[in-house]
């Protein structure tokens, strides 16, 4: 599973004279890099015949796992603690 992320030139003041480029993992749907670990793991389970994946998370890991599962045609269940923020809960439900 490949998800392109944009490259942006870093502001000159960040690394003067270097010409630094940034790979912006925060610029895709999930807004985090966690999908890079979740996607191949979910795909491995799918290729072994899994129908669903289950994880426990308070945010980005759970969202990435659910995202990867949906794109692999699998069902996902994410357990979150009662203390999870409403923002993270909304992300998990997406």
Question: What would you call each of these model-derived segments?
Answer:
Residues 1-94:
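PLP-dependent amino-acid enzyme catalytic core
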